[in-house]
């Protein structure tokens, strides 16, 4: 976080590149199917053909909707992100809302400027309501942290989004907290790095390459920033909705096979 802050102060373009690298490094954490077990845990599996096809179909639909109505899709993505991040925070679910809105307290104009560029919609008149909303969420998060005796973690989250620029703050949370937590949980079950690589690689490698290519194309001016962002949002959105739960209900409980066993 300090490094990103220093980079932003000394060289904003370098800070942006560093943040994009963090986003890319966090991509593999979502490259698995996660099905709930009877005891409430999540089993991680290599994506099946059915899951992959459904994922790609939903991503294509999301990208088409982004091209048609970018503001509506941006709003949907932010809502889905808040829910997704909140579900990954067992002690402080309000952290999900904070990750999405926290930067609006200190960096109101820069955050809205990002939303404006992506949605191609004028949003400056929402600056006061946006700041009030973010402040309300921050207070609620502090109260929740006090009630659950998790003040230190809440203070860390508040600091990240009040001290770092919006892109760096989200990138740091996404990689260092959200993605690494997922990998730690998987490692606790899988036990070895080799086993984790076999689990994550089939889906994460092509997505990682595609993400790097998209960032490069946008940097070189081959595609617009809103188009690149829409592609990234379309790829991420199916991971944030309960896709695995829907597929599980439609086909019944998943039956572990030798290649898929991940719990002992």
Residues covered by each model-derived region:
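Transmembrane helix interruption/hinge and helix-loop junction motifs
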Residues: 8-16, 63-74, 148, 161-170, ...
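Membrane-interface helix-loop-helix junctions at boundaries between adjacent transmembrane segments
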Residues: 39-50, 57-122
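C-terminal ends of transmembrane helices
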Residues: 30-40, 79-92, 139-148, 180-190, ...
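Hydrophobic core segments of alpha-helical transmembrane domains in multi-pass membrane proteins
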Residues: 16-26, 70-83, 154-158, 169-181, ...
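N-terminal signal-anchor module of multipass membrane proteins
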Residues: 1-28, 232-233, 245, 249, ...
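Hydrophobic, membrane-inserted alpha-helices
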Residues: 1-5, 53-63, 79-85, 137-141, ...
């Amino acid at each position: 976080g300090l490094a990103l802050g220093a980079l932003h102060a000394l060289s904003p373009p370098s800070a942006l590149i560093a943040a994009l690298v963090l986003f890319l490094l966090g991509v593999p954490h979502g490259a698995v199917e996660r099905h709930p077990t009877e005891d409430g845990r999540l089993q991680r599996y290599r994506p099946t053909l059915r899951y992959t096809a459904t994922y790609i179909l939903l991503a294509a639909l999301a990208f088409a909707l982004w091209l048609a109505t970018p503001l509506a899709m941006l709003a949907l993505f932010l809502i889905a992100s808040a829910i997704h991040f909140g579900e990954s925070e067992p002690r402080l679910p309000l952290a999900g809302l904070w990750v999405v809105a926290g930067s609006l307290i200190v960096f109101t104009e820069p955050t809205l400027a990002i939303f404006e560029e992506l949605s191609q919609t004028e949003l400056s008149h929402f600056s006061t309501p946006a700041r009030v909303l973010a402040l309300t969420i921050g207070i609620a998060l502090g109260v929740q942290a006090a009630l659950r005796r998790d003040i230190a973690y809440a203070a860390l989250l508040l600091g990240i989004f009040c001290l770092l620029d919006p892109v760096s703050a989200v990138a740091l949370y996404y990689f260092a907290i959200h993605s690494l937590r997922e990998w730690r949980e998987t490692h606790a079950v899988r036990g070895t790095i080799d086993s984790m690589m076999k689990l994550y690689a089939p889906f994460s490698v092509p997505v990682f390459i595609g993400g790097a290519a998209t960032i490069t194309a946008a940097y070189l001016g081959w595609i617009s920033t809103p188009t690149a962002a829409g592609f990234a949002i379309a790829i991420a959105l199916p991971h944030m909705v309960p896709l695995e739960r829907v597929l599980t209900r439609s086909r019944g409980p998943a039956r572990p096979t030798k290649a898929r066993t991940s719990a002992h």
